[in-house]
């Protein structure tokens, strides 16, 4: 999930990193500055290494956004909570419902950030799409969505 969000924010022109490694999470937390933002993603919200990294980042003055269930230790440490509640999975510790809910929240967050950043973000996304088209990604099957609520942008092609 974090890698997906990192890639999306990067395409919008934001500096973002995703760290799964415990030690790199700690270093990333220590490297934060006042005004920095850490987005912590965990459905269960209780992994000690992630909680430690969040504490370190907050100690440096960073704000913490958490994508997690509302009743978790991570939620309690967040400055901004994107609380996600899904029923427990009968088989998996974290089931497909949780995965899809987190992915949907990441998509919504990406759209909101793009809208907030305005035209420069739209231009970056269009350049990325053009790069995909040049290298054989199936762009014709997946038309570019308009960020201004105007529907599908066909780039002058008939849809």
Feature map (PLM): residue ranges:
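Glycine-rich phosphate-binding loops that contact phosphosugars or nucleotide phosphates
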Residues: 1-104, 108-115
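Internal, active-site/partner-interface "lid" segment
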Residues: 116-158
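Structured catalytic/translocation cores of nucleotide/phosphate-coupled proteins
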Residues: 69, 158-159
